[in-house]
Amino acid sequence: MSTPLMVLGTSSGAGKSLMSAALCRLLLRQGETPIPFKGQNMSNNAWVDESGGEMAYSQALQAWAAGLKPQCAMNPVLLKPQGDSTSEVIHLGQSVGTARAETYYEQWFRPGWSVIREALKDLQCSYTHGRLVLEGAGSPVEVNLQRRDLTNLRLAQFLRARCLLVADIERGGVFAQIMGTLSLLKPVEKQLIRGLLINRFRGRRELFDEGRDWLEAETGIPVIGVMPWLEELFPPEDSLDLLERRGKKNDAEIEIAVLKLPSLSNFSDLDPLEAEPTVQLRWVEPGTFLGMPDAVIIPGSKQTLRDLNSLNRSGLGSQLQTYAQSGGHVFGICGGMQMLGRTLADPLGLEGVTTTDPSSSMAGLNLLPLDTVFKRNKALSQCQRITQWPDNAKVKGFELHHGNSQLIQGSHESVLPMADDPSMGWVSKNESCGQVAGTYLHGIFENGRWRRLWLNLIRKQKGLADLPTDISNHEQQREQLLNRLADVFEEHVNINPLLGT
């Protein structure tokens, strides 16, 4: 294999994930086989690969940028936060337990390092002529964590990777970020840094020339690029950044409110709607006013019962019920659909609130006649279906859930199955409760025809003309965005120092 490359950052949110994706696409253009890899990631924005293994969405995106199918070996350790300083631990795509922050490295460091090396071996055997493109996590110089590092310098030294250090100038203090990071590196670690990259620069590049010269003189490391500010092309890995995303669209014709749940997961499900020029997404947090949007989406949740509690305590749940009863459109995805049901029971405490007695199940929003029980085994699979609502359409996506939802006995006359597989989701026929529907299929909005059919239901209610439904799926738009990202990266970044040329 070619010498591995690694993208490190001075902090979380510096832009490592997108710069890694850009690097993968650029190497692919140059005839290489880049292989994305992040030893350990912490995220509730997940993807399910063809084998039924969970991995972080950011590594799936990097795989697409590299022209490869995502596989969980590209992210062998995934930590999915579930509140109270506890995370679900995923090794090579499968759940292996939960861990508390204070004991994680004591209990899970050795098993984690073992599966990371196993995944690396598998990838190296599968792509003998490839080049690993590694992504670090957070900052590589968190002094209190370095002894148990699984993702940054331990991996860089193990593979003798050539490293790129990315700093976000938008946050301010970029010189302190870089100089502070380099000063905390040991000499043997600093030798691995082959280039510096300034990310999210606004304005004319020549205004940074003096700063670039100073950094190179002080560090002895070339500044190989200054990436301009790009309106965020893809969802941030951290859900805390969601409210800082795009502003108001000038051409938006419909507004869709999306509930920003405390344990929000799989928010990349909404990315195809973000890409619709006539759609404005408005993220609504518990405790804020819902208003009368044209539709409401309840996305997935890592802690469904806990998030349902939050909706009820804040009054947002009752606002949503009133909205639906007034004829509004409500759509739930996975945990969001479960919340729309009558009851939710979690006897094992998997979703935030333990309900050991079925009779003590938590009440849902009661907008769909569903009862849900959360079970130990998790449904993990990619799937294809033919929808029956809003109309016939081929759709594909993936399932990722503990909950098993069943229609209440005698309620079949009040709902329609969404697809040829009735368990994929349901839509209410009760017009007094609005157009309420839900699905277990993550990625449903990636399907272009289905997305437009759903949007046209909303547009019809507003008296707007239908949008064309004969369109491509979002994966083609994603390809265009990846190419745009790589175009800008190629224009502004010289990767030769990384390649040793």
From Swiss-Prot:
A molecular function (GO) held by this record is: ABC-type vitamin B12 transporter activity
Q: Which CDD domains match?
A: GATase1_CobQ
Q: Which Gene3D superfamilies match?
A: 3.40.50.880, P-loop containing nucleotide triphosphate hydrolases
Keyword hit for GTP-binding? no
Q: In which pathway does it act?
A: Cofactor biosynthesis; adenosylcobalamin biosynthesis
Q: Tell me which Gene Ontology terms the entry assigns under biological process.
A: cobalamin biosynthetic process
- Record keywords: Transmembrane included? no
Query: What top-level branch of life does the organism fall under?
Result: Bacteria
Keywords on record: Cobalamin biosynthesis, Glutamine amidotransferase
UniProt cross-references to NCBIfam families, sorted A to Z: cobQ (TIGR00313), PRK00784.1 (NF001989)
What does this gene product do?
A: Catalyzes amidations at positions B, D, E, and G on adenosylcobyrinic A,C-diamide. NH(2) groups are provided by glutamine, and one molecule of ATP is hydrogenolyzed for each amidation.
Q: Which family does it belong to?
A: Belongs to the CobB/CobQ family. CobQ subfamily.
Q: Give the protein name, as stated in the record.
A: Cobyric acid synthase
